[in-house]
């Protein structure tokens, strides 16, 4: 997913030869960095490099044959250690400007419980939930009673993973324990959330910062393979889901969801870009589901589709994100800090 997103971003930016010289960097699952000739999966011709903290260079070949001074980094990376504040913190340590949310917003956005708490404080409706911790253990009977009280189904989700990894729909209380055990394979904390009958999944994209935020048209994703938008429907089954942009919802409802998307993004202290996901019931009531602070960026991803529906040019959005990254870095550099 990260590779597909990065390929699109690299292609669009590489077409702007008067503005950018693009250096694609591949990071392996082992954490090793490689400079690529063309953005894509790992290739034998990729050059091993290492990030360094120097005034004259940020990236140096392991054989010493070359070095690069990066003006800005576009961390088109998804998942653990990528969009959860880890990479952002590393780039802060290198003192390199980078696109997207900072350490705090990235970390909070990746945590489903923290982002729900922030959404609630921002006045955005959320669904009831419980947290299960691997370390603390859990009272299965109490959780089953809570699930029955809320009304089945409930959804069990790892707290700090993507929207589809490790997720199970629990239709009976007898299924709850196996769903918890499954999710706890992927994270130390698990969210048990009340389900929504006949839920529609509505999305809104955001870019900018502070008072200069733009929200996209709302889009809807319908699952073709399976009962909900799980990992199988998202990545495995061809045509497992269908996207409709703009979503077929009343204009006033779409406007309210856009406003709530902006409210969550601002409350999270977001900067750069994000996609905010909602669940809507059959009566038109909607609830915040999660925020993705580095959404998919490929041509078929929701982020470019949602802004394209508003007449926004993808290349200009990328230009704006890079310019914002430079402004944010300059603003931090101007602060009086005791280092």
Where do the model's predicted regions map?
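Hydrophobic beta-strand scaffold residues
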Residues: 22, 97-98, 126, 154, ...
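Active-site nucleotide/adenylate-binding loops and adjacent lid/helix of ATP-dependent enzymes
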Residues: 4-7, 11, 67, 108-199, ...
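Surface-exposed helix-capping loop/turn segments at secondary-structure junctions
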Residues: 17-20, 196, 266-273
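ATP-binding N-terminal substructure of ATP-dependent carboxylate-amine bond-forming enzymes
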Residues: 1-104, 108-110, 114, 132-145, ...
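A glycine- and small-aliphatic-rich helix-loop capping segment at beta-alpha/alpha-beta transitions
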Residues: 89-98, 174-177, 309-311
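Phosphate-binding site of ATP-dependent enzymes
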Residues: 171-259, 280-287
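ATP-dependent carboxylate activation and anion-phosphoryl transfer catalytic cores
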Residues: 248-339
């Amino acid at each position: 997913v990260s590779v597909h997103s990065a390929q699109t971003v690299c292609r669009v930016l590489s077409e702007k030869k008067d503005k950018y010289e693009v250096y694609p960097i591949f990071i392996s699952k082992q954490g090793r960095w490689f400079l690529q000739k063309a953005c894509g999966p790992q290739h034998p011709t990729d050059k091993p490099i290492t990030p360094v903290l120097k005034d004259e260079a940020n990236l140096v070949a392991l054989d010493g044959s070359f070095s690069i001074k990066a003006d800005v980094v576009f961390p088109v990376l998804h998942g653990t250690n990528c969009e959860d504040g880890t990479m952002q913190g590393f780039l802060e340590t290198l003192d390199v400007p980078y696109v997207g949310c900072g350490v705090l917003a990235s970390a909070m956005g990746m945590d489903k419980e923290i982002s729900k708490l922030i959404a609630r404080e921002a006045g955005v409706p959320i669904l009831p939930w419980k947290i299960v911790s691997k370390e603390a253990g859990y009272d299965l009977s109490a959780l089953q009673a809570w699930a029955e009280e809320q009304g089945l189904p409930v959804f069990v989700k790892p707290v700090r993973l993507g929207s589809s990894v490790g997720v199970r729909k629990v239709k009976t209380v007898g299924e709850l324990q196996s769903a918890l055990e499954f999710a706890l394979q992927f994270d130390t904390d698990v969210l048990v959330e009340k389900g929504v009958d006949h839920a529609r999944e509505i999305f809104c994209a955001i870019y900018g910062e502070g008072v200069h935020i733009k929200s996209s048209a709302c889009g809807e994703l319908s699952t073709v393979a399976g009962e909900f938008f799980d990992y199988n429907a998202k990545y495995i089954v061809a045509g497992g889901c269908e996207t409709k942009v703009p979503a077929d919802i009343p204009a006033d409802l779409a406007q309210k969801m856009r406003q709530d998307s902006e409210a969550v993004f601002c409350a999270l202290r977001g900067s750069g870009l994000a996609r905010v996901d909602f669940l809507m019931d059959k009566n038109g009531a909607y609830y915040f589901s999660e925020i993705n602070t580095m959404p998919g960026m490929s041509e078929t991803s929701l982020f470019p589709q949602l802004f394209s529906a508003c007449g926004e040019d993808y290349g200009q959005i990328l230009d704006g994100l890079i310019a914002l990254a430079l402004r944010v870095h300059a603003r931090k550099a101007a602060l009086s800090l005791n280092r």
